[in-house]
Amino acid sequence: MKTEGLHHVTAFARDPQENLRFYTEVLGLRLVKKTVNFDDPGTYHFYFGNQNGDPGTIMTFFPFQGSGQGTVGKGQAGRVYFSVPSGSLSFWKERLEKSGLSLEEKTLFGEKGLIFDDTEDLPLAIMEDAKSGKSEWTPDGITTNEAITGMKGVLLYSYDPQATIQLLTESFGYTKVAEEDQIVRLASSAAVGGVIDVHLHPEKRGVGGYGTVHHVAFRTKKKEQAKWLPIIAENHLPSSEILDREYFTSVYFREKGGILFEIATDEPGFMTDETFAELGTSLKLPEWLEKHRQQITDILPEL
């Protein structure tokens, strides 16, 4: 089996309004779905992505105002990399610095990028990537020559880096393509969301909270999802059953390095309950929560 790369990455945030502002107004992503955490309906679940919310472009957040700050470290995904067109780094450097962010210009595996944290300390990077195409979602001040095209990949901090690398190469179809500065780069054939970096010697233990990643989701077709269950079991990794998340179905498991992984389907996508023009404009609830809409909206912070 081979995954088609990343489906989405989900992280914790604290302030829902600030989370919305930063990812839509500063990074220029589209809010493609505003819903709730199905396991905790008193917490929003925001999905940001390209114009359609295509797999591989999606960054999602659980913003919980009562959350304490987390610590990025072992047992987590660390930095999330976004792709932008070649030649656009100077634009992003100016834009991010105007937003008050501290940046580090860095070349990773021969690719130029900007390393920074978002306004709630989640580690991010913007990397030039000629292979990722261009985005049609261009909010004010951003053109197709600069707009984020999707996720490039993530950096993993594993308790057992070699076991994580073995799982991704032997069971998920990734290939080791390079190693530098104690980081191994793995790649799939996906043009968007195709890169996984694994740090060989992470130091700190990760602690969940705002500013940290909750889980990393990999893509699959719906007809292929059940085939992943025996693969996960063969690696002696307990998994969830297949869960309906409205816009995809999911299987969750924690790999041997302590990182929570998900296998998520491309189908049905985010236009099951909203048109293209309506995406992200209203609070959407699954049918089983719709009868509790008033109680839920009374709890949720006003945006």
Curated annotation (Swiss-Prot):
Gene Ontology biological process? catabolic process; response to toxic substance
User: So where does Fe cation get bound?
Assistant: H8, H215, E262
Cellular component terms per the entry's GO annotation: cytoplasm
Q: What keyword terms does UniProt attach to this protein?
A: Aromatic hydrocarbons catabolism, Cytoplasm, Detoxification, Dioxygenase, Iron, Metal-binding, Oxidoreductase, Repeat
Q: What is its EC number?
A: 1.13.11.-
- Organism of derivation: Bacillus subtilis (strain 168)
Q: What protein name does the entry list?
A: Putative ring-cleaving dioxygenase MhqE
Q: Which residues form the VOC domain?
A: 5-129, 150-266
Task: Give the disruption phenotype, in one or two sentences.
Answer: No visible phenotype. Growth is not inhibited by 2-methylhydroquinone or catechol.
